Amino acid sequence: MNDNPANAEPQEEEVSLESQPSTPESGSDGSKEAELEAKIKELEDSYLRVHADFENTKKRLEREKFQALEYAYEKIAKDLLPIVDTLEIALKSANEVSGEESELQAKFKEGLELTLDNFSKVLQRHGIEMIACEGEFDPHLHECIMQVPSPSHQEGEIVQVFQKGYRYKERVLRPAMVSIAKSN
């Protein structure tokens, strides 16, 4: 026998039946099982809800990403619209000059027309369209800034356009500012 306790072999302990946990009685066994099944069902439901929330969030983020890419030109288009307005005003002013038109004025007007035409083509190529302003007033596309009596128009019809409106795909970038006819 070895006197060194570090090298000593572990001795087997005898385990009596009294130290073993007692088996549950048959009545409480059924309730414990039902309790565990209820807990499993609760955890499964919780898992399904969390998984559904995750999938919905994933789909929403994918949709938002697609829309962000789809409408990427919207901000720059809004910034370009005042430039188009300024070119149109300059062309209108050049056309209203009275008197004899010099060759320089004619070339200037031609340059403005070409610039405005190119601008319009670029906007159209990128899906930016001018809002039509004929006929009936549409509050989704037009902004009424005044009502005027007009014997040649029916009530609610657009009489005059003060500023053109534009849309990018389905979204209105800027509503058209118009006056509409009112009844006398």
Curated annotation (Swiss-Prot):
Keyword tags: Chaperone, Cytoplasm, Stress response
Signal sequence bounds: none
InterPro entries xrefs: GrpE, GrpE_coiled_coil, GrpE_head
Disordered: annotated segments: 1-35
GO cellular component entries: cytosol
UniProt GO BP: protein folding
One MF annotation (Gene Ontology) recorded for this entry: protein-folding chaperone binding
Pfam family, one: GrpE
CDD domains in the record: GrpE
Compartment(s) where it occurs, according to its Swiss-Prot or TrEMBL record: Cytoplasm
Comp. bias intervals (Polar residues): 17-29
Family statement: Belongs to the GrpE family.
Quaternary assembly: Homodimer.
Function statement: Participates actively in the response to hyperosmotic and heat shock by preventing the aggregation of stress-denatured proteins, in association with DnaK and GrpE. It is the nucleotide exchange factor for DnaK and may function as a thermosensor. Unfolded proteins bind initially to DnaJ; upon interaction with the DnaJ-bound protein, DnaK hydrolyzes its bound ATP, resulting in the formation of a stable complex. GrpE releases ADP from DnaK; ATP binding to DnaK triggers the release of the substrate protein, thus completing the reaction cycle.
Protein name: Protein GrpE
Organism of origin: Wolinella succinogenes (strain ATCC 29543 / DSM 1740 / CCUG 13145 / JCM 31913 / LMG 7466 / NCTC 11488 / FDC 602W)
